[in-house]
């Protein structure tokens, strides 16, 4: 499938891709649409009693199964059955077909309107019309994509898959509709039109024009067909590269006696009849062997095997790189990196390289400090080698755990029941941003599994502003990876859309398909509320209500805070147009809210809000908080900087591969490039004299999904560290409303409607030394270098 209109419009991060007839009168009177179940109306609490009750309920719905059963069954008597996530169509598998075809008809009407536009009024509405087209496409695609993965019923999975496919087929039609691009360009070039556009409309128009350009819609037919063919080849090659990664040799044969240090049970699993053992080159066993086998020669063999890809895997990668370079050349760019980065904060591969090399410099002293400690452990046995690193790191961690790690730390999870952590998130959001999480009963048919909890997000005036479905407990066949999904984006629903529903023959027609809406009383407009799903894989609490609830490790707590950071961006980034709402921002800015949220998870000021013993309700003691901090610092000092260097190296390799012009990319030697980058920037590089040479790049699956943008996570991490240090004062202002409002107003509320550099400069302030002479606002090479100088710090989290 070739490049398409939808994929850019969805603008989803790594991945991972947000009233009825009386509504029109509601807009005129600013009265609440009380006749509809789509959005719950909250009575103002007037005092703290309701808030306290909601807070207590939030903890209990996650920690007590009997309480949850009682809570979830209350709705049976007074709530009418509904569809999945309140979508009025999705009451049965066939509803996906009706949902998709009905939405398709709405899309076709918008396309016809745009193509027929001739008047000034027609062109003035064009940015908003195409934004609505994007919203309609994403309504089906995003929700169907999620349901086909998460729903336990195969019939629903199949129906969702078909709805998904139908909309993709329609996108192929849009890809050939050159008139959409032509009309939007006419509108954007007319000063009389743009003078009446809002800032959001101007931004969305430019985004869509760029997206059209990237999909080759402006090219002559033969070039466009070549573009589509290349896109198809890239997709297929990329998927194969990710899913068929393989080593040059499947295993390493060694003497079983030489595996001393490895768990004897594992040795028995791989032992052969002739006293040898076959160590696989992929999976958990080789990783454990590198950590624990005492024999350096064995570690060397295993290490080299795990770092050497098969020849056909390298061939796949090099074909992928060559086709991407050709695609960029066809589109008028010097390289794939130039094409990909043109609308990112970085703007160019040169700027990314400046950031990464600056980061190497700020990280290098910490790396040397860590390696010096490991070298002293190896002593006279020789110079530290790359296959030694995991082994001596493990030895240092064991030494630390045996000598200085506090026994109190083993009890820390008892203060992190899932309910208390969710309670803590709500309390933190209330302190910083004036919003909180309220457990809400669900109607029959609303959730895809009986253990899914619904939380409504309300503000200080008790106005409903978002919906979060929490699917946090493990179950058979559920994907274990934590994730955030935007099922419906925030946007303003126009009066015309409400009127359209009011005049339809279908009395149940709803401008948001029955999903959550709310009236903005100040603007007298109807809003489509963001609907979000959070998915994790935590153990379920006991059914009887006796015994421990689901207790989280520190790592799991940080993971939950990370995913909720994405949700927070969707909740507070409520723009008028959906193409720039919430997380729909530049790829290299999208991880900032989630990475920053991790810092709050274990800050003492935040722990004091929620960390309480699941049984006694005793708060986490100050001494335990101090031990947690010491433990993180100790682990970070053992391996944090080397982990940073590894991430930086991968980002540098990604840039080196994707910055090559088409002429050079067709004959690329990816292994030589990998070793060249390693020799220049890696403190402990792979040897270059092995035959065959190591070719770790064949296992770097993110080269497909994040081609030319792998730097994004560490870029956002550097920014997050700076904001934590200077805005939230290294945690001292972690629950300070003034700091929270500053961050919300300068970063979160904009979604993707403001240049990321303006957000960073705004939240740091014009007087900040890093923003001297407006260097951050301007972005570019110097701003990227400045962020590189901020560094990544060292952060180790014990399991």
Curated annotation (Swiss-Prot):
GO terms for cellular component: mitochondrial matrix. The active site is at residue 563. Gene3D superfamilies: Collagenase (Catalytic Domain), Neurolysin, domain 3. Cleaves proteins, imported into the mitochondrion, to their mature size. While most mitochondrial precursor proteins are processed to the mature form in one step by mitochondrial processing peptidase (MPP), the sequential cleavage by MIP of an octapeptide after initial processing by MPP is a required step for a subgroup of nuclear-encoded precursor proteins destined for the matrix or the inner membrane. It catalyses: Release of an N-terminal octapeptide as second stage of processing of some proteins imported into the mitochondrion. It is found in: Mitochondrion matrix. GO terms for biological process: peptide metabolic process; protein processing involved in protein targeting to mitochondrion. This is Mitochondrial intermediate peptidase. The keyword Mitochondrion applies.
